[in-house]
Design a protein with these regions (language model features):
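A secondary-structure capping/hinge motif
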Residues: 54-56, 109
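Short hydrophobic/aromatic patch on the recognition helix
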Residues: 39-50
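Hydrophobic alpha-helical segments that form the core
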Residues: 152-171, 187-191
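Alpha-helical DNA-contacting segments of helix-turn-helix folds
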Residues: 50, 58-64
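C-terminal peripheral helix-coil segments that are non-catalytic and often amphipathic
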Residues: 1, 88-96, 129-141, 145, ...
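Hydrophobic alpha-helical connector segments
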Residues: 59, 73-102, 154-161
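Basic, helix-initiating cap at the start of DNA-binding domains
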Residues: 1-25, 29-41, 55
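Amphipathic alpha-helical segments used for helix-helix packing
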Residues: 99-119
Length: 198
């Protein structure tokens, strides 16, 4: 029998109300009681709209990722040069608003789910690969626009930038020291400067 949610508006409300909770506490750390408190709904109301907790978590991850992507698009579209477009990602990740909502959903979900929850791990991997492809595209366009050096390896640069950003977030959140985020993102900026045509 196919599961049919009772109401799209209630379903959307549940997703929005629990997205930050899942991003902060993770799948394993979020109980049905947490979901009830976050939504002010009963277990029956929640599960009348979702088959199980996993389905709520997957929808919450999708919502968190879509929110992050929207921030990226807005910042990238506002930037004029390809260098500025790439640096816009750094600005998003250093924004306290992202920290206050639990941090990077790709990292949070990927770290928790890598050995424990295949469906969430796959979603996080898709998000990470999409992030990489967006950077590769910007770098390649920057090469064509003669903003970046012709021999710049877009794939390598994109992976390095992601590793620096995600590593900076991990260090900063683990040590509760935002200055380390600033330091590592500064190094990432210097790395991007090296591919720019002066």
């Amino acid at each position: 029998m196919k599961f049919v949610p009772k109401s799209e508006s209630t379903r959307s409300f549940i997703i929005e109300a629990t997205a930050e909770l899942f991003n902060k506490k993770g799948y394993a750390g979020t109980s049905i009681t947490d979901l009830e408190k976050a939504t002010n709904l009963t277990k029956g109301s929640i599960y009348g709209n979702f088959e199980n907790k996993e389905q709520v978590a997957l929808a919450a991850f999708d919502y968190n990722l879509a929110t992050l992507r929207k921030r990226f698009r807005t910042a990238v579209d506002a930037a004029s040069s390809y260098k500025e477009k790439i640096l816009a990602y750094f600005a998003i990740y250093s924004n306290p608003q992202l920290v206050n909502t639990g941090g990077c959903p790709i990292q949070n979900t990927g770290v928790e789910a890598d050995d424990t929850h295949e469906a969430l791990r796959e979603r996080a991997a898709e998000g990470l690969l999409s992030f990489k492809e967006n950077l590769v595209e910007l770098i390649n366009k920057g090469i064509l626009a003669k903003e970046f050096k012709a021999d710049a390896n877009a794939e390598k640069i994109a992976l390095t930038v992601i590793a620096l950003i995600e590593g900076a977030i991990l260090i900063s959140r683990t040590t509760k020291d935002r200055s380390s985020l600033k330091t590592v993102l500064g190094s990432a900026r210097e790395y991007i400067e090296q591919i720019c045509i002066k």
